[in-house]
Every structure is written in structure tokens, then in C-alpha cells.
């Protein structure tokens, strides 16, 4: 069945001001503070604390006392930061671990008291849609599959002609031990996945970013730029195979990821084998970017990033520097380039001093 996008996911409307988004995930709790309701593309503050709320939830269906304690301490710290930075609008959201736990009120009630704000527990569809919206608002995707692998869930979204066509959220994540048979059974239950081969696979979440980091380290890739990194499908499968066999360490993988990297690699590898993509593209976006996009309805899907230039130029060290550089270059390229390149040259000049 095709997916019809609602007009809004969380129905958030805010006046122009600083906003704080708190992403309470299965593995970590993250605070990101943006100026100007998130229209400015670079955050004022960004911090993540590993709380592992989803740890052992697959065994007990409950959040553990220790994980709740860790998460509440993280929120206490974040609450102080939010107050000191004079942020009026706080948007806390929780995903798979809190959503699936029978005892989630033992965490939610004290957490809301600490933050003085209601925590939105995202449904599976909301989480998947926000993950897709976050990527589409920051990356040009016409057709492809978005895979957001977290600690407690895997969201799969089919994109057709730049829009969400189908989506699903599976209860597998790098904190949930599953064998290959279980992963394959869950992936086979997604009927549209098998029919969506030879598309680009866009991977988001810490596990996919770890794959990107491992690729850079193990292939001597010249640039350490993970967002937008494109990896050959065969290379991805081979690298994930090595990650599955790794024991105590693996080049490019953060040490705190090693305890769950085998499970994450197993999920990613079987996903890649199931949908047989053209390429695997690593993306640094998240549901937080989706929330920012929803707050700013004028920020259309697959936007022209030149609209962000006015925010970048505000942070120039020397006012008017972009105009000076352009005046120097214009005579050199006047008869050599077309209108499209001239536009790009102008943007490059505007970005030259930020």
C-alpha cells in the first residue's frame, strides 16, 4: 500500500526563536539547540550522551533501572544548558525503546518533570516519516530507499519522484541481538523491498555512519567526509563481512560501538543483499532534521541550498569580502563560463569567508 503524507507529523508551530530538540533514542540521548527556529543550518549546541535505554529491553520488555537513571541524569544536564542558553521552546521526542517498554512511564513522568515539557513518544510511522523528511530536506533524492538504523528499530522508506511512497518500521536495531535468519524473515515481510532493487540506498544513523568511517579508514579514502559518502555495493558487503568477524577492535569503528557492531553489520549486510542497491550512500541526517523541516514549512523537500547563503554570510569575518572576490574573478571567467556556472561561482564567493 502506498503511503500518503499528512500535512504535518507532529503539528508543531513556533514563533521565530531558539529551539531545543531532545532526541531520546534507544542508544543515546542528544540535545541540539538551533537559532532562528532551526532555519539557520548550523546548531548552536550539539551534545550526545550514551544512555543505552534500549539495553536488554528485548529480554524484559522494560527499561532497566540503570538505563533510566543514566537518561534522567543526561536530561538534568540538558535542562540546565537549555535554561542557561535561554531557550524557550523545547521539543523532546522519544523513539523505539520508550515506545516499546511496558514501564515507560517510570521514565517519562520524571523526565517530563525535569524538562518542564511534554515528551512526544513517536509512533513507528512518525519516526520513519521524520527520518525521511530530515534526509529529503538536506539531500537531493529522486528515487531510492532510506534506511535509518537505530538501537531499537530499523526504518525503511521508499522514495519515488522525491516523495515518500512507502514506509515501514521494523523492531530490529543494533542493541537487539538477532541472528541472520531473524533479520531475513523481517526483511522478507517488507514486500515492496524485493521489488525495489537497483536503487540507491541512503543509510542514516550511527551504525551507517560507522560503516562510512570504516570505509574511509580501511580504503585510505582521501577525505574524511561521511555525509554524502558513496560506497560501492560489493565493497559495502565485503567490509560488513569483516566487521561481523571483528572481535575487540576494527579500524574506523569507535570503541564504544564495538560491543554492538557485529549485530549492526549483520542487519546492514542483509538489508543490502535484500534490496541490491546501485550504491550505498551514507548520510548524516536524522529525525531532528525532520523536526526542523516541519517547524519551517517553507523549507521544501529537496531544497535549493542557495537559500541558506544569507545565514552563512552573516558569520563572515570581513563584511563585503564576497563582493571583492567576485570582482577579482569576474574578468577572468567572463567569456569562459555559462550562466549556471556563474551562479555557482557567486555562491562560492559568498561561502569563501565564513
Regions found by a protein language model. Name each.
Residues 1-20, 24-29, 34-94, 105-118:
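N-terminal glycine/serine-rich phosphate-binding loop of ATP-dependent small-molecule kinases
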Residues 19-23, 144-148, 201:
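Short glycine-aspartate micro-motif
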Residues 26-28, 135, 150-156, 206:
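Ser/Thr-glycine-rich phosphate-binding loops at phosphate-binding pockets of nucleotides
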Amino acid at each position: 500500500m502506498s503511503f500518503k503524507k499528512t500535512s504535518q507529523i507532529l503539528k508543531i508551530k513556533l514563533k521565530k526563536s531558539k529551539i531545543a530538540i531532545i532526541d531520546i533514542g534507544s542508544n543515546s540521548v542528544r540535545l541540539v539547540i538551533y537559532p532562528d527556529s532551526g532555519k539557520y543550518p548550523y546548531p548552536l549546541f550539539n551534545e550526545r550522551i550514551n544512555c543505552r535505554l534500549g539495553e536488554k529491553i528485548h529480554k524484559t520488555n522494560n527499561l532497566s533501572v540503570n538505563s533510566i537513571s543514566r537518561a534522567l541524569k543526561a536530561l538534568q544536564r540538558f535542562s540546565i544548558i537549555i535554561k542557561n542558553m535561554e531557550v524557550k521552546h523545547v521539543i523532546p521526542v522519544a523513539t523505539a525503546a520508550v515506545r516499546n517498554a511496558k514501564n515507560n512511564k517510570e521514565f517519562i513522568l520524571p523526565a517530563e518533570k525535569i524538562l518542564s515539557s511534554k515528551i512526544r513518544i513517536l509512533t513507528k510511522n512518525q519516526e520513519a516519516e521524520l527520518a525521511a523528511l530530515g534526509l529529503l530536506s538536506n539531500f537531493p533524492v529522486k528515487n531510492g530507499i532510506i534506511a535509518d538504523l537505530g538501537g531499537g528499530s530499523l526504518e525503511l522508506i521508499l522514495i519515488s519522484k522525491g516523495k515518500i511512497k512507502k514506509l515501514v518500521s521494523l523492531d530490529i536495531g543494533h542493541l537487539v541481538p538477532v541472528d541472520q535468519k531473524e533479520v531475513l524473515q523481517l526483511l522478507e515481510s517488507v514486500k515492496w523491498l524485493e521489488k525495489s532493487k537497483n536503487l540507491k540506498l541512503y543509510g542514516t544513523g550511527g551504525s551507517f555512519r560507522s560503516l562510512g568511517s570504516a570505509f574511509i579508514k580501511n580504503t585510505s579514502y582521501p577525505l574524511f567526509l561521511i555525509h554524502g559518502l558513496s560506497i560501492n555495493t560489493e565493497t559495502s558487503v565485503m567490509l560488513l563481512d569483516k566487521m561481523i568477524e571483528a572481535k575487540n577492535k576494527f579500524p574506523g569503528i569507535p570503541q564504544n560501538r564495538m560491543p554492538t557492531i557485529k549485530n549492526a553489520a549483520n542487519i546492514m549486510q542483509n538489508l543490502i543483499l535484500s534490496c541490491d542497491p546501485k550504491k550505498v550512500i551514507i548520510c548524516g541526517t536524522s529525525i531532528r532534521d525532520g523536526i526542523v523541516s516541519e517547524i519551517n514549512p517553507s523549507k521544501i523537500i529537496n531544497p535549493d541550498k542557495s537559500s541558506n547563503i544569507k545565514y552563512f554570510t552573516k558569520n563572515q569575518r570581513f563584511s563585503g569580502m564576497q563582493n571583492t572576490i567576485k570582482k577579482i574573478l569576474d574578468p577572468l571567467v567572463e567569456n569562459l563560463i555559462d550562466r549556471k556556472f556563474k551562479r555557482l561561482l557567486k555562491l562560492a564567493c559568498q561561502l569563501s569567508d565564513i
